[in-house]
Regions:
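Membrane-embedded helix-loop-helix hairpins and adjacent transmembrane boundary segments
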Residues: 1-669
């Protein structure tokens, strides 16, 4: 574990934990006297704390690991989800006035006031289950990957560091979340935001320097052959540093010599005098790929005495690098509609539906704005958070591309990034092998900040949902002190569930981490988004329509998820699905397309049932719909912003459009 970390690294880590735990302890000493204090931080937070908390709670370990992984595998495609910063503007300018004027603690509570008690219970239970199965599980898995990549040697006995890291983060974060409540989450996240931005910025700048600068990264990741797979064979004793052994390609390879030249330039590896690139058609891979065999010294070679004498026998690892004739297109946001994960039509129309659900209606996010002292502070917090939200495009996705570029230029320490399923290791491997001693501690602190902020946010949101939406309904006469302690016990129980879920996480997370998260959210979010937005903008929508839309949307979403799992199996169910055109489409179409269909189906059911049933009573629409606002509420909302808020909003939209323009290639394919 100690290998590669210097005194200053450990000093930075120690300083980070000292400041973090000191802040948490200071918050605990402030005492949470009521449920309002514990769950909404006393409703006294300012715009900076709110914006930083929005960013830190969203940017968790799944972003550091998952976004960098998608950057190493598909380039800028996943940036669409990070450019949903504009959804925060919708939250601040449109949704917050309804939430704050209604005085609710939770999003399910808002649904009860707009529709019925059944809507509140349904959303509360479903949200709790989805948090445990998605947010907690994804964060724990990503945390385990980070610890395993940074510290491969066991810390305690023979315990795998994947397990140690996941359990350690869960317990530590759970302790200060239980003790300090929402106020502890807010103020520790403000610190973690600074650490995270500084740490990720160091990785980006030093990584770009290592790969040769921005233009070199574009050259490597745009228009060159794609490295489609890497396998590592057994280590052998060898007296060479880096050689490419010659294997004659078959005569019928056609244009293989051209690819051979591309491969040599693509890898940019020093070839020992007399040696030539080893290229052949790989019979186990598609005919459109070739193989480069590379023998290189082990990653710790530079730390051995043998490194000074290249004639001495050294342990080397033989790598087989599979190059596809497909050209890289990493700097293009728009993929063809045939792309399995990121078709441009689905990203343009389906992904925003998930973004509006997440940023405008999910308890995990909206709870931060409910802590504001007034609407003005809440709105400015969302604007500030939206600006911060654009940073991941460059701080997390681009480093993944940098890791790919460094690996394809011959740095075998980063070759795991090129392996099947190994892209998720891009960010932690950059930290481990590219950063100099002294900066690693700061960046590892940023990684830990992402882990802990994600867990703290979901723990507090879960305890709030359980205590306010479920327990308080069952025990309506519970005192404020009693509710605070129930919230703490609920958090402790969530922590325990998180630990017990770790073994299942390993099974669930086979493949791309971020794809898994976005696909599940695409099956959960659309019906909830439809219920909230139609409820606010259409007074005619009633409780019957709400419950019908939620039921249809959830059933279709679960059916898609189960069908997708069955279709990937080897049993009779997979054969049945493959033979049925509709089932094959339903289980195989991109999750971005499915988000569109789920939203359309849920909205159609909500509107149809509402029109066929009586209008909602006046108390369900007054102050809770756009046209039902009073003159006083409109005046209060108008008094909460000035020209600088408008200028900041326009500036954000301009920044987003600029990024879209810069990274747009041939879109309609």
């Amino acid at each position: 574990m100690l290998q590669g970390l210097g005194v200053w690294d450990w000093a930075a880590l120690a300083g980070y934990f000292a400041i973090l735990l000191g802040t948490a302890w200071w918050v605990v000493l402030q005492r949470n006297k009521s449920s309002r204090d514990y769950f909404l931080a006393g409703k006294n937070a300012g715009w900076f704390v709110i914006g930083a908390s929005l960013f830190a709670s969203n940017i968790g370990s799944e972003h550091l690991v998952g976004l960098a992984g998608t950057g190493a595998r598909d380039g800028m495609a996943m940036a669409h989800y990070e450019l949903h910063a504009w959804c925060l503007l919708v939250l601040g300018w449109i949704m917050v006035p309804f939430y704050t004027s209604s005085g609710v603690f939770t999003m399910p509570e808002f649904l009860e006031r707009r529709y019925c008690a059944a809507a509140r219970w349904t959303l509360s239970v479903f949200s709790l289950l989805s948090y445990i199965l998605t947010k907690i599980s994804v964060t724990l898995f990503a945390g385990g990957i980070v610890f395993k990549a940074l510290f491969p040697d066991p810390i305690i006995g023979g315990l795998d560091n994947f397990w140690f890291g996941a359990v350690f983060m869960v317990v530590l974060t759970g302790l200060y979340t239980i003790a300090g409540g929402m106020r502890a989450v807010l103020y520790t996240e403000a610190i973690q935001t600074v650490v995270l931005l500084v740490g990720a910025g160091c990785v980006l700048l030093i990584g770009l320097h290592q790969v040769g600068g921005w233009q070199r990264l574009r050259d490597v990741c745009q228009g060159t052959p794609r490295m489609v797979a890497v396998t590592s064979e057994v280590e052998v004793a060898q007296s060479t540093q880096r050689t490419l052994t010659q294997i004659e390609p078959p005569a019928e390879t056609g244009d293989i010599p051209e690819i051979a030249q591309d491969a040599e330039e693509f890898l940019d590896i020093e070839i020992e005098p007399g040696a030539e690139p080893a290229l052949e058609l790989d019979v186990t891979q598609p005919a459109e790929s070739v193989v480069v065999e590379l023998e290189s010294a082990g990653e710790n070679r530079e730390q051995t005495a043998a490194a000074e004498d290249v004639s001495a026998p050294q342990k080397t690892r033989r790598w087989r690098l599979f190059l596809s004739r497909e050209k890289l297109d990493f700097f293009n946001l728009w993929k063809p509609n045939s792309h399995p994960s990121y078709p441009w039509f689905g990203l343009l129309f389906g992904a925003p539906i998930v973004g509006l659900w997440y940023w405008c209606t999910d308890q995990y996010i909206v709870q931060r704005t409910l802590t504001a002292r007034n609407q003005s502070q809440a709105r400015r917090g969302t604007i500030f958070g939206a600006y911060l939200k654009m940073f991941p495009v460059f701080l997390f996705i681009v480093p993944g591309m940098v890791a790919y570029g460094i690996a394809t230029q011959g740095d075998t320490r980063l070759f795991p990034v090129l392996t099947d399923g190994g892209a998720n290791q891009a960010f932690p491997l950059l930290v481990k092998h590219v950063l100099p001693v002294g900066l690693k501690g700061i960046v590892i602190g940023g990684l830990l900040a992402a882990l802990m902020s994600s867990l703290a946010s979901v723990f507090n949101s879960c305890s709030t949902l359980f205590t306010i939406d479920i327990y308080k309904k069952l025990v309506p006469n519970a005192s404020e002190t009693h509710l605070v302690w129930v919230g703490r016990l609920a958090t402790a129980f969530i922590v325990l569930l998180g630990i017990l879920w770790i073994p299942v996480v390993i099974i669930l997370m086979k493949g791309s981490l971020y794809d898994y998260l976005q696909s599940v959210q695409s099956y959960i979010g659309p019906p909830i988004a439809a219920v909230f937005f139609l409820g606010i903008f259409c007074k005619r929508v009633n409780a019957a329509g709400c419950m019908s839309g939620l039921a249809v949307g959830f059933i279709l979403g679960v059916a898609r998820l189960v069908g997708e799992i069955l279709s990937r199996g080897n049993g009779s169910a997979a054969e049945t699905i493959a033979m049925n055109p509709f089932l094959s489409w339903f289980t195989g179409t991109s999750f971005t397309f499915m988000a569109i269909w789920l939203f359309v189906a849920s909205s159609a059911v909500i509107l149809a049932v509402s029109l066929l049933t009586p209008k909602p009573p006046k108390e369900k629409t007054d102050r809770l719909t756009w046209s039902g606002r009073s003159a006083e509420e409109r005046a209060e909302a108008r008094a909460g912003w000035n020209k600088w808020d408008v200028i900041a909003t326009i500036g954000l939209v301009a920044c987003i459009l600029s990024i879209y323009i810069y990274f747009t290639g041939n879109m309609f394919r």
